Structures are given as C-alpha cells and as structure tokens.
A protein has these predicted regions:
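Nucleotidyltransferase catalytic core that binds NTPs
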Residues: 1-202
C-alpha cells in the first residue's frame, strides 16, 4: 500500500510492508479524551485500516506534559467513556499504562515500557498535524523516533512539515475537539453526532 511521507523539502511515496509476519503491528492514539469524541474514533479506525495494523489502542494520559492547568475529567470517567465508545468496534482497544503509572505522561517513558513489555510488537504512534509541528520539543524525541513510527493525520487549519520520519494518512476531516464538546455542554447545547450516544448518555 502506497503511503505518503512528507518533509518540508520532499514528498515521496513509500511502500509500507509488514516488517515480519510474526511481529504484531499496533497503533497508539494518545490523548486526554476529555471526553472522547467521534473524530478520535474515526482517526483510530482509518489509520488501522489504511496501514493494515492489527489494532489501534487509545491511550488516555494521566497528566499531559504539554498542557498547563487543564481542567481534566477524572481518569475513571475518561476510561469509562472510552470503554463505552469502542465497545463492539473491531480492532480498537484501550491501553491504560499511563493511568496506572500516574504522574506526567511523557511518551518516551511510556513507549520504553511498552517496548520492554512487548518486544515482538512494532508501534505506530498517531498524532495530529498540529503535534507534528511540536515534535522538536517532545521529551527525548531523537530516542523516541527510534522506538516508534510516527503517523500523522491532517486536521482542519493545520498544514505541517517535519524533518522527522512521519507516515501521513488521509482521514475525513472533522473539526471536533473535546474542548468544543465541553463548551457545548456548558452552554446547554447537546453535542449530538459529535460524541458516541453512549458517552452522551453517560455525561
């Protein structure tokens, strides 16, 4: 399957292949999921299908390293809503390592632990185009890129380029964010079709 790799200077096509048939291919979509919304699910599902991954795990952060004093729903509720949101969806799961470890959720530390725990798994770390621009500031980024393959997905109003190796995947653009969902709820508006109905009922 031909996948585009974009840098500020070049645009080439790569043939993405399974490295070894006996190795598991797993995508990781990290986030606060505050709350989870339909764009999260579309991104996870489309990356899984297009890169032919075995599964994509949604990984809720305990404390995001890049956000200051962000109002965050209790981790129990964020996990419960994620569990409801992915119920019955093929190839999607939840990775709770950062909730269990607690503290600031640095991706390098998390992926180091996951690689040690699952040495026969190749990880694809999924990020939005806005986070691609931020990659140079990530904790131990040069070591991290040797541990995972970054996968970038386009977001409305963001056009990104980077010198780091990123596989770009086209997904339907949905301008939905967790903060938008929270604002709707604060204003007394119902975020129909923005979040799974089970999550809406839970809220």
């Amino acid at each position: 399957m031909a996948i585009e790799l974009l840098t500020p200077f070049t645009k080439v096509e790569l043939e993405v292949e399974k490295k070894e048939t006996n190795r598991k291919q797993v995508g990781i979509l990290g986030g606060n999921f505050n709350p989870v919304h339909n764009a999260h699910l579309i991104v996870a599902d489309q990356v899984r299908q297009q890169l032919q991954l075995d599964e994509v795990l949604l990984m809720p952060e305990f404390i995001p390293p890049h956000v200051d004093k962000k109002e965050t729903i209790d981790e129990y509720h964020r996990y419960s809503m994620l569990k409801m949101a992915i119920a019955g969806i093929e190839g999607l799961g939840i990775e709770t390592i950062e909730l269990e470890r607690r503290g600031v959720s640095y991706t390098y530390d998390t992926m180091k632990l996951l690689k040690e725990k699952n040495p026969d798994t190749d990880y694809y770390f999924i990020i939005g185009a806005d986070m691609v621009d931020y990659l140079p500031k990530w904790h131990k980024i040069d070591e991290l890129v040797t541990m995972v393959q970054f996968v970038g997905v386009q977001r409305p109003r963001y056009k990104a380029g980077t010198s780091y190796p990123v596989i770009w995947v086209d997904v339907p653009l949905m301008d939905i964010s967790s903060s938008m969902v929270r604002d709707f709820i604060k204003q007394g508006r119902v975020p129909n079709f923005m979040i799974p109905h089970e999550v809406l009922d839970y809220i």
